[in-house]
Amino acid sequence: MSASFYILYSHVLDRYYTGHTEDDMTERLRRHNANHKGFTGKTNDWTVVYMEKYPSKDDAYARERLVKSWKSRIKIEKLIMENPPPAGL
């Protein structure tokens, strides 16, 4: 089963959120924008700004941990600008 590493952006919060999933990305985004607890529950305007596919959930999680370790908005924005998101998300 394949998995995805993704970065979401909220205009309301002006913040990025990184995550990984084995689910369909459209469905995962819908759940992030639904009223739920957790960081992404603070607003419902999240959009996918970056996504990478991986052969396993472990690989996607490793990528998420790497990007989070940067602790750098500048590096995240550079990654996004060099690799725009797929159309339709």
List each language-model region with its residue ranges.
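GIY-YIG nuclease catalytic motif and its immediate N-terminal context
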Residues: 1-37, 41-51, 58-68, 72, ...
